[in-house]
Amino acid sequence: MDAGSSRSLENAVNKIYHDQLVPKINTSKKMSTLAHPPNILEMPQEIKKNCGGKQVEITLERIKMTKSIKEKQSNDLEKAAFKRKAEGEEKPTRKKEAKIIELDNQLITMPLPHIPLKNIMDVEMKLVYIDEVGVRYEFVESFMSTGSQPTCRVAEIVDPLSVPNFSFLPQIDKWLQVALKDASSCYRQKKYALAAGQFRTALELCSKGAVLEEPFDASAEDIASVASFIETKLVTCYLRMRKPDLALNHAHRSIVLNPAYFRNHLRQATVFRCLERYSEAARSAMIADYMFWLGGGREQSISKLIKLYWQAMIEEAITRAESFSVMYTPFATKIRADKIEKVKDVFTKTHPAYAEYIYTDLQTLHMLPQTVDWSSFPPQQYLLTLGFKNKEDGKFLEKISSRKLPIFTEHKTPFGLTREDTVRQMETMGKRILPILDFIRSTQLNGSFPASSGVMEKLQYAGLLSQLQRVKEQSQVINQAMAELATIPYLRDISQQEAELLQSLMADAMDTLEGRRNDNERVWNTIQKVGQIEDFLYQLEDSFLKTKKLRTARRQKTKMKRLQIVQQS
């Protein structure tokens, strides 16, 4: 496909999103885990300000739907907890005390486990590269009463024997169905380039309105589900062709269109793995496992496979990291200051080469795939400690713990950066800051929004790329940020103010991708400027207080000298 038609297709696809959106293994290093050994999971035998009215409607609809899903899961957990309490209250108490004893008395450093590459590939073959024999499109509504069906809509080609026959499901447009059948036929014949071309044609048909047989009665969710399915098939085609760079944006878009389907996140994890972006792959796998549980998934074999993949990606991220090392500390009670100091002492003894700067994440708690159980409340949680060889590499983390607005600048004049300053700041963000934040978030499901979500940093990084006219990289970063934004309502409860901010960020991100200009500044740039002004005011205050302190000390010294002179005379 030539460049002109590629741009045409990109614009056509973006038009659909605009209307339907809501929002080789190195074992030389060690990861420390206190008390709990990180065992390898066993392999078992066998998912604006509105640019258009629909975008806000779908965002709000998804937020409401997510709340109802979480309420149901919460009610189930409360019932289970009440049942355990009725059976006997002594048993949980003994278990809690055992955890405290482990933390206090058994500070053990465990070697990093090794998960063979074959196991990782097995997971991908079973959950990512699935090729369904029968063509079936599902628009599954919530089955809250049964608890056995997915609770969010999904569009997927599946084996017809694996699901009930729903007669009310919307019918696909006949021309689109022909294009998809031809593409699937090419895929099964391992003609992946031809299949990708057919799927691109299908996507273009979608952009022209040929999605469902009754387009005027179709909901935006149903249309988005079909488009998401086509995007996922393009992801698998490009992965088969060993072109993960081409698959990346399609993986992001599939999540934007259908964030509730766990396989979309797992496919994104596979793309990140192929690109050797292991921290991001780990986070995607973690979200996939959570979405599988949130959607009513009950097959433990699938969850074990996803957790194995998540664990493998964390392992690889740690072994590849050169500037820092990590330690996870399990705990069951409130974190006390003496415990934090004890953890830091253990870290210093365990990793003396990484003790120039030690950071303990007190903002949010972390989970590991070896022990996480989404159905238990709360799941086993860990305190994350990072140590750095170079103090400057981790110093920016101070701002994360002390500021609500995530901004990073190394310049005294942040509002008038030269091109050289912009390049320097872009490299700092891309090579030092974002990789560490991505690693922190690989075991952190629901950090605060926007401060700990990682989205603002990515959008600010995209702004730097835009200033340097690196359009392709900017597009990828924005697509990734949009996928994160679309997923946030499923991971945590958000307030009305946060929902409005999320919609504004999504709308501005969409406008940026489409090349639209308006008189208003992008939301993330405004937030960054507010943060920079706040930084400037803090610096002025610090400078004033230091000057005042020096002046007071000088006056006191002068006064003492005068008294001494008077006494001597």
UniProtKB/Swiss-Prot annotation:
Its main location: Golgi. Pfam families: NYD-SP12_N. SUPFAM superfamilies: TPR-like. It is found in: Golgi apparatus; Cytoplasmic vesicle, Secretory vesicle, Acrosome. GO terms for cellular component: acrosomal vesicle; Golgi apparatus. It comes from the Eukaryota. Gene3D superfamilies: Tetratricopeptide repeat domain. Keywords: Cytoplasmic vesicle, Developmental protein, Differentiation, Golgi apparatus, Spermatogenesis. GO terms for biological process: spermatid development. Essential for spermiogenesis and male fertility. Involved in the formation of sperm acrosome during spermatogenesis. PANTHER family: SPERMATOGENESIS-ASSOCIATED PROTEIN 16. Belongs to the SPATA16 family. This is Spermatogenesis-associated protein 16. The gene is SPATA16.
